[in-house]
Every structure is written in C-alpha cells, then in structure tokens.
Regions:
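Short glycine-enriched loops at secondary-structure junctions
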Residues: 2-6, 111-113, 161-164
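A structural signal for short, well-ordered beta-strand segments and their strand-loop junctions
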Residues: 1, 26, 44-46, 82, ...
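Short, charged, surface-exposed secondary-structure boundary motifs
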Residues: 8-11, 56, 117, 168
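Phosphate-binding site of ATP-dependent enzymes
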Residues: 30-31, 38-42, 48-140
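Conserved N-proximal alpha/beta basic substrate-recognition cap immediately N-terminal to
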Residues: 1-32
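Short, hinge-like loop/turn segments at secondary-structure boundaries
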Residues: 14-19, 43, 62-63
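ATP-dependent carboxylate activation and anion-phosphoryl transfer catalytic cores
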Residues: 115-116, 129-185
Length: 185
C-alpha cells in the first residue's frame, strides 16, 4: 500500500527484526562510526536513501582515507548513515528473496560481486545466479511475511548475506524476471 511505502525505510526496516541482522549502527555522528569500526575492525557504511550500491563503502581501521570517506558518505555530518559489521559471506552472494502477498517465492537471486568489488549489486557489475532458498532463508522469509503483510507490504524483496537480513526492499524489489527465467516459478 502507499502508506506502507511511506512508512518503510528499506534500510531501517531491518531493525524491527534484530535477531536476523548483523551488528548495526545508525547515526549522524562520525565519532560513533569510528567507535563501531574499532569494535568490529571491518564494516560497511551506506546512506539510508541509497540504492544500486551507490555510496556504499567498506572500511578498515587502518584505511588512510577513513576521514574523507566518512565526510563523503555522511555529507559532513548532515546525513544519517547505517554501519554494519562486514559479512564475509558476501563472497557467496547477496541474495534477494521475494515475498508476494505474504507468500514466499521458493527461489532466490544471488548477486555475486565482480572480482575486486565489495558491492554485489547488478548496477555495480555483479552477476545473478538463481537457486532454491536454503532452509534458513525460507525460515526468515516465512517469519517476516505476516508482519510485512499486516503493515500493508504486499510485495517485498528481502536481501540476505549469509544468515543476516541486510535490507527489506519495498519500492523496487527487483528480481522477478531473473527468478522467473531461472526457476520453475
């Protein structure tokens, strides 16, 4: 529904399902990002309003460009960003799971990053592989589906890296064509 599209920030919606997410921080304060980075050593930062892999950065404690990257992604402290512990399973793909009217599509599109790239988004040069959902992916999707439906979300694309939910896409849950062509759905 239109109200659900306005209510759901695709990045923040995962916070309602904290048992399924990697350690996460949402802030406008670069000092808190540095503390979070000190705790986890390897993190991803991204704007709340981004899409297609734009302005997503992987940060390491010793990165000499750390200050510049944070200034850029945080627009000099005027933009709220999300930081998440880096999930090494990204090498196996960032998986898109579709939920349509509360029903879980039993296949996923795994977006694999191109060599030398952290972002697996197709817009960033990633490739797509279609495969059946794992039991864990199916369990996550079936747990979230009723809550999404109750909140007026009839179409959603859940993004997972390894065992972690990373995003709930409601405005452009891509993957229909790829999953339809690559499966028996």
């Amino acid at each position: 529904s239109g109200a659900a599209l306005r209510k759901y920030n695709e990045k923040l919606a995962i916070l309602d399902f904290s048992e399924w997410i990697a350690p996460t921080l949402v802030t406008t304060n670069p000092d808190l990002i540095l503390i979070f980075l000190g705790q986890y050593q390897d993190i991803i930062v991204k704007p709340l309003d981004g899409m297609g892999g734009r302005e997503i950065f992987r940060l390491h404690k010793a990165d000499p460009n750390l200050g510049s990257i944070l200034e850029t992604v945080m627009h000099y402290g005027t933009r709220t960003i999300m930081a998440q512990k880096y999930i090494p399973d990204i090498k196996k793909g960032d998986k898109r799971i579709l939920i349509i009217d509360g029903q879980v599509v039993p296949y996923t599109m795994a977006r694999i990053a191109k060599k030398g790239e952290t972002r697996a988004n197709l817009a960033a040069g990633g490739t797509a592989n279609i495969m059946p959902l794992t039991e864990k992916e199916y369990d996550l999707a079936t747990e979230l589906a009723p809550t999404l439906l109750t909140n007026g979300v009839f179409l959603a694309g859940l993004d997972m890296i390894g065992p972690y939910l990373t995003e709930i896409n409601v405005t452009s849950p891509m993957g229909f064509q790829e999953i339809s062509k690559g499966s028996d759905c």
